[in-house]
């Protein structure tokens, strides 16, 4: 219980100052305009949490996927392990880590990275495995080595599935990062809990999280379209 209360005790509860709309706990555009600056730092913290966690998670899952691709027997245990981690309630995982690594940005990152693995690893290994054997045989017939086939044939063909997993992992991380305040990492979740009963505050902080998830998703989608020009050509 003390681990749960510590992050809450560190929150600087915001006082509400405004007219009738604020006192009646309505949706107050004027209050929002006057207080937008208080959301800048939490938003930047949220972006940092998401970007670092997804980047680290991608690097780890990429290495695991390459390892499992060459040693197929590893696929099942790695998939099972990532699935088990994802079943752990997010708040519980943050609180489990706090006594070990303390209240910090990196405590939140460890938890968020762990949650990305179930999407990233599964999509990466599926993308590599689903490359048709006849395509790889044709590449070998042209004189390409196994390493060249991996990077010139298998990896490009796996890109759509890999980036699909990245989109899901990123959106999920934006969502889970709202709970990073339990690890003392701030973010939009901390802003929400500063005044969770005030509708305007919750709407703005929650809306920013949704907007952030949409922007990440659109950015990855644009990258996917640039990396898979053959799909655009087929669509036209």
Where would I find each of the regions flagged by the language model?
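Short cytosolic juxtamembrane segments of multi-pass membrane proteins
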Residues: 224-236
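Loop-to-helix entry region at the N-terminal start of transmembrane alpha-helices
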Residues: 38-49, 95-119, 201-205, 209
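Cytoplasmic-entry segments and transmembrane alpha-helices of multi-pass inner-membrane transporters
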Residues: 64-97, 122-126, 130
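Membrane-embedded alpha-helices of multi-pass transport/permease systems
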Residues: 59-64, 107-136, 159, 163-174, ...
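Short helix-to-coil transition segments within interhelical loops
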Residues: 128-158, 185
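Transmembrane alpha-helices
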Residues: 51, 114, 146-179, 210-211
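Hydrophobic alpha-helical transmembrane segments of polytopic membrane proteins
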Residues: 188-224
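Periplasmic/extracellular loop-to-transmembrane helix junction in inner-membrane transport proteins
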Residues: 4-53
């Amino acid at each position: 219980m003390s681990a749960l209360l510590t992050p809450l005790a560190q929150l600087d509860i915001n006082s509400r100052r405004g007219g009738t709309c604020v006192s009646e706990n309505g949706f107050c555009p004027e209050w929002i305009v006057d207080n937008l600056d208080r959301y800048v730092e939490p938003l930047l913290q949220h972006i940092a949490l998401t970007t670092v966690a997804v980047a680290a998670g991608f690097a780890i899952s990429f290495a695991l996927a390459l390892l499992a691709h060459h040693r197929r027997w590893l696929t099942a245990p790695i998939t099972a392990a990532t699935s088990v981690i994802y079943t752990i309630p997010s708040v519980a995982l943050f609180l489990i880590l706090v006594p070990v690594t303390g209240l910090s940005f990196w405590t939140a990152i460890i938890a968020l990275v762990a949650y990305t693995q179930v999407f990233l690893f599964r999509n990466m290994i599926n993308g590599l495995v689903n490359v048709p054997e006849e395509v790889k045989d044709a590449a070998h017939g042209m004189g390409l080595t196994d390493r060249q086939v991996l990077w010139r044939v298998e990896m490009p063909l796996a890109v759509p599935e890999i980036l699909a997993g990245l989109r899901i992992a990123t959106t999920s991380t934006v969502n889970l990062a709202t709970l990073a305040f339990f690890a003392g990492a701030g973010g939009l979740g901390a802003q929400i809990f500063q005044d969770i009963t005030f509708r305007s505050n919750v709407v703005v902080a929650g809306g920013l999280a949704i907007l952030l998830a949409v922007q990440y998703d659109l950015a990855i989608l644009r990258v996917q379209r640039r990396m898979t020009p053959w799909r655009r050509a087929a669509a036209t």
